[in-house]
Amino acid sequence: MTPRQEQLIALGAIFESAYLVDRIAKTGLAGEAHLACMLGSLLVRNPKDTLEVYGGDDLNLLDGYRALASALERNPQSLQREPLRYSLALVTLERQLDKRDDMLQLMGRRLDQIQLQVQHLGLTHESVVAAFASLYEDTLSTFRQRIQVHGEMRHLQNPANAARIRALLLAGIRSARLWRQLGGHRWQLVFSRRKLLDELYPLIRRN
């Protein structure tokens, strides 16, 4: 796997988190396997490669790949605006988080505790999702710049949906961190669009 392909997997995962946030906000729905894939990425330490972070394959990242492709293609008719907005906001938030060693250490400790919950309850149990959501609230929600999620009020006001959205935003931050560690930069989305698309299309077709 090439370095750019590794980056695309992580970048696609950012967009997958954003896509799921948008879907829950607008419909109240999200696939269990997709949710588990993204939440599980928060608990993977020292992976041997990027795919291992997401369960060993990228089957559950397809919607993210498509949302990313729509952003890179710049076609107003197919552009998924909210997933793009959330994804860019996640990348920006991650850069702020990187300057906060104290917060990173806190997140590491809390994720260790959540790992124990997962062993007993499973990744998508409401108590586990609530724990991820609480971690997001206690850390990233304290930054001046917050991510404003738009959708149907009846879905946004549902406590379970709100928890899933926050948990997915936390997962998006994890993927944004991985993307940057793999050499990803925002300018690539502007100046390397064609190169990214040339490698992204085969990933979409493969799935």
Swiss-Prot record:
GO CC term, one of those recorded: plasma membrane
SUPFAM superfamilies hit by this protein: YcfC-like
Entry keywords, A to Z: Cell inner membrane, Cell membrane, Cytoplasm, Membrane
Keyword Membrane tagged: yes
Domain of life: Bacteria
Membrane topology, as annotated: Peripheral membrane protein
Places the protein is found: Cytoplasm; Cell inner membrane
Chief location of this protein within or outside the cell: cytoplasm
Similarity annotation: Belongs to the HflD family.
Protein name: High frequency lysogenization protein HflD homolog
Encoding gene, per UniProt annotation: hflD
